[in-house]
Amino acid sequence: YLFAVICTIGLFTSCSDDDEKVLCPIGETTFTDSKGLQLTYSGEMMLGKSVIFTPNSSDATKATLTLTGNRELAMIDTRETHVPPISGVIPGQSTTTLNIENMIIDGNKVIFEGVEESNGCIIKYKGDAISGEMNLALEVTMPSNPLANTSWNMAPTGSMWEGDPMAPIHVKWDADEFPFGNGTWDINSAITMIFSMAQIEGKHIPELLSGVLNKVTFLPDGNIQAEYKDALTDTEWKTSGLNIAMYTVKDGQVFLFLNFAQILATVNERANDSMNDIVASLLPQLLQMVNRGIPLSYIVGEDGKMTVYLGTEVLLPILKTVAPLFENEEFVARLLDNPERTSWREAVLIESFLKPILVAMPQIVSTTKDIQIGLKLVQAEK
């Protein structure tokens, strides 16, 4: 009889313990922009990302957050059966895992915060979630690199007689000469001539660039910010938002990560048919670069000036993809068409100089040995 009483008491005690066991009110859930995710990075909204919340099955105070890109964006190009690695939340990381300790359960809500180190990055996180909604704030410090906390202005534009007439634009294109008039011409000289002669709103192309882009800053959180104007006539410089362009530095190269969703949310959708043709043909390669990072070479000279550029390994595959389009006369005509053209000088320049270059583009591309396109910069005063 005494043994039966002891067993009965033990049974009731066991049931009582089970009733008091704390359970996480949220099961494994994937949060995205369209599924309740409010993600901020350095205090500003970050779009196009995914956070998977996974509770610990044996300890309700623990969970993991898996940060990655939104896989739906990587599948925009349905012609590809293979989906490339997606650019994640932290620049250079396709996936980042945060291990939550001491999570607080408040009714149907979970509250958490902590610090995680991932591949040299220090990630401070704070957030909360209920079923179907998550708020997550990240403050990130990237590994130290030579560009962090530096700002650069556009190199000053010279003239055909003094300084560098192409600055701040950097172009080096080594290819066989192409037919031009009664002789031949090399593409490097042709580009220099056109950039120095063509004018938009009374300014040559290098001057135009310097007139709308003033400064580029590499922030320690992995963001790149630009100081810019929407138009030459604007009197004040604007600062670009965060989480649009991000970077890492690895093996002497800068890898640029563009937030596809963030760009689409702010992009001006005006484009002519020819540009749409080019974008469509390049979409698979563009998606690869957006997801894996665009490799930029950079050189800092003894004078402190920096040249940042896309190299042959990036540009030549792109050029080979679009080169066949220039064999189509209608495509070239559409590309050159500009209903707003009013200057006879501009018309002569396009017909006499630019059109022969575009027609010869397949030949130029097929004989290209080296190509660099980028920016020439000088360190900004602090």
Feature locations, PLM:
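C-terminal motif of bacterial Sec signal peptides marking the signal peptidase cleavage site
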Residues: 11-14
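Contiguous, well-ordered beta-strand patches that form the walls/edges
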Residues: 62-123, 200-327
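Acidic, serine/threonine- and glycine-rich low-complexity intrinsically disordered segments
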Residues: 141-231, 235-238, 258-260, 265-275, ...
